[in-house]
Amino acid sequence: MLLEYLQAALRHAHYEILKDDGTYYGEIPECRGVYANAATLEACREELREVLEEWVLFRVHQNLTLPVIDSIELTIKEVA
């Protein structure tokens, strides 16, 4: 389920080439604060994936909600 969520989120990524320095900028609008900047598109995609993974883990650790993406809802259940 986690892998499916990450893949779905990455499909929502938007990329652009920054005019001032020609680097690539990528973000996932549904995941506030998840963005990356790199010299190549592939490096930007890889960095964005890493940032997304860290963002999800941080939110889970802090018991914060995650946005539903493509009908995928990650919820953490408390175990006794």
Residues covered by each model-derived region:
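Short, charged, surface-exposed hinge/linker loops at domain edges
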Residues: 1-14, 21, 46-80
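Structural detector for hydrophobic anchor residues on beta-strands
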Residues: 11, 24, 34-36
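Short aromatic-glycine-(Arg/Gly/Cys) micro-motifs in beta-strand/loop hairpins
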Residues: 16-29
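Gly/Ser/Thr-rich helix-start
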Residues: 27, 34, 64
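A short, exposed loop/beta-hairpin motif centered on an aromatic-Gly-Thr core
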Residues: 32-42
